Swiss-Prot record:
Signal peptide: none annotated. It catalyses: Cleaves type-1 transmembrane domains using a catalytic dyad composed of serine and histidine that are contributed by different transmembrane domains. It is found in: Mitochondrion inner membrane. GO terms for cellular component: mitochondrial inner membrane; mitochondrion; nucleus. This is Presenilin-associated rhomboid-like protein, mitochondrial. It comes from Mus musculus. The active site is at S275 (nucleophile), H333. It is an enzyme of class 3 (hydrolase). Belongs to the peptidase S54 family. P-beta is proteolytically processed (beta-cleavage) in a PARL-dependent manner. The chain crosses the membrane at residues 100-119, 166-185, 206-228, 243-260, 271-287, 294-316, 331-352.
Length: 377
């Protein structure tokens, strides 16, 4: 009884701490929360468990971009990632296996499809020529409608070069994805499939989809302006079909180089934008026409050669990759530029000029396809 009175007066715990008459102590009750050692040290007793340490919650690793607010203030080019969780593998090298084979397979399919596309285009040009003659004859006998919106659109479309017509579809796709970023209910889906990150659960498809993804209007406008400016030159060099294959392959290859750099340095984070593919276009044109003159849009007075511009860009991206600058994905830029230089120097001879076996196989399929009617002769 003396012990019970001392506990009640000194610890202020009530009768729950009193010993039973039969000796020993009964189990502690959690109906009251005893206070020990003043206000700063509160221990809550669990029933039938004594003093048990609360289990520690293990949280998955988040993107290595500092705090969410700091990352968003530092760069407006990436989407907000407050609720995004990434899962880096305990064996980082293994995460590169699937992207590596995806890069090889997609590049092969892109160039194979471009070769078949070119074959079909050449085959349909004769028919298109006669269709054009017929259309001109019909236009000559039909009464012309002044101020027709469709006529004005056709006139504008016909005034574009082949390169500008080709990149118009690419620009439209980028604009569509940019609009999807503005839909709040699609944020998680967009971050998962339209940003590339080796710590994400989805590795392969974002390597292509992120090439058409921009979160910032300024980022998209700058990339599309550069693409539009170099579109005529690159299509004149490669042709429409080969350019599309190079552009899509460059987006995947530049993202794979970015994956390798992020895994090697341990600096995981999402990337998006067409900069890697556009760097391939820029590097290809500058390598093919190194004496060409370029200028900055806001400083047209200062001009420089394309060769010097390419050297400066490669030097800046190399420094950014080594020093760990986070505003741009310098590894993707550098990978795209090196791919553009390699393709103009060697890739065109190794890949595009060896497409004839595939074209012959496709020609045989188109010519000797399954005959209608069947039956024996």
């Amino acid at each position: 009884m003396a012990l019970q009175g001392w506990v009640q007066r000194g610890w202020r715990c009530g009768p729950a701490w009193a010993p039973p008459l039969g000796g020993g102590y009964r189990e502690l009750s959690a109906t009251q929360a005893p206070r020990l050692l003043g206000r700063r040290f509160n221990l809550f007793v669990q029933q039938k468990c004594g003093f048990r340490k609360a289990p520690r919650k293990v949280e998955p690793r988040r993107s290595d971009t500092g705090s969410s607010g700091e990352a968003y203030k530092r760069s407006a080019l990436i989407p907000p990632l407050e609720e995004t969780v990434f899962y880096p593998s305990p064996y980082p090298i293994r995460t590169l296996v699937k992207p590596f084979f995806f890069t090889i397979g997609f590049t092969g399919c892109a160039f194979g499809s471009a070769a078949i596309w070119q074959y079909e285009s050449l085959k349909s040009r004769v028919q298109s020529y006669f269709d054009g003659i017929k259309a001109d004859w019909l236009d000559s006998i039909r009464p012309q409608k002044e101020g027709n919106l469709r006529k004005e659109i056709n006139k504008w479309w016909n005034s574009l070069s082949d390169g500008q017509r080709t990149v118009t579809g690419i620009i439209a796709a980028n604009a569509l994805v940019f609009c999807l970023w503005r839909v709040p209910s699609l944020q998680r889906t967009m971050i998962r499939y339209f940003t590339s990150n080796p710590a994400s659960k989805v590795l392969c498809s974002p390597m292509l989809l992120s090439t058409f993804s921009h979160f910032s209007l300024f980022h998209m406008a700058a990339n599309m302006y550069v693409l539009w400016s170099f579109s005529s030159s690159i299509v004149n060099i490669l042709g429409q079909e080969q350019f599309v294959a190079v552009y899509l392959s460059a987006g995947v290859i530049s993202n794979f180089v970015s994956y390798v750099c992020k895994v090697a340095t341990g600096r995981y984070g999402p990337s998006l934008g067409a900069s890697g593919a556009i760097m391939t276009v820029l590097a290809a044109v500058c390598t093919k026409i190194p004496e060409g003159r370029l200028a900055i849009i806001f400083l047209p007075v200062f001009t420089f050669t394309a060769g010097n511009a390419l050297k400066a860009i490669i030097a800046m991206d190399t420094a950014g990759m080594i020093l760990g600058w986070k505003f741009f994905d310098h590894a993707a830029h550098l990978g795209g530029a090196l791919f553009g230089i390699w393709y103009i120097t060697y890739g065109h001879e190794l890949i595009w000029k060896n497409r004839e076996p595939l074209v012959k196989i496709w020609h045989e399929i188109r010519t000797n396809g399954p005959k209608k009617g069947g039956g024996s002769k």
